[in-house]
């Protein structure tokens, strides 16, 4: 894959991840003036995750680092635009939720309960469940850590 193809794939990923970020921001009643910023933050988060995964990081660590970036930028923008950081960050990380692995784990659980136990199906269930849980944990920890760092009143040492 050439640099132009990679750049075009990255731009496509960022544009397509901005759309659900705006959609969920509208569901959460984010003010209209903040919708473009939610789209930009969703695109930056998903694009940075894709960039790190292309560099060789696994999806869990890439998601953690991308959510750290989203949380930090959201806190800075909340100071500039006098809004709560969750206005920008919550809708921006929703495109990074692990839909495919969670769905595969759920389908595996249904197949096990319907067809009976089989070792390959149980391995698929556990693998996808742990992957989805790790990604959701990375998202939640990555969003909360910048607030703990930046809003700390006492000295760290």
Swiss-Prot record:
Function noted in UniProt: Involved in succinate export with YjjP. Both proteins are required for export.
Subunit structure: The transporter is composed of YjjB and YjjP.
A Pfam family: ThrE_2
Name of the protein in its database record: Probable succinate transporter subunit YjjB
Transmembrane stretches, start-end: 6-26, 55-75, 87-107, 129-149
Family the entry assigns: Belongs to the ThrE exporter (TC 2.A.79) family.
Gene: yjjB
HAMAP family registered for this protein in UniProt: YjjB (MF_01191)
Example GO BP: succinate transport
Keywords: Cell inner membrane, Cell membrane, Membrane, Transmembrane, Transmembrane helix, Transport
A GO CC term attached to the entry: plasma membrane
Location within or outside the cell: Cell inner membrane
Native organism: Salmonella arizonae (strain ATCC BAA-731 / CDC346-86 / RSK2980)
InterPro entries assigned: ThrE_2 (IPR024528), ThrE_Dicarb/AminoAcid_Exp (IPR050539), YjjB (IPR020914)
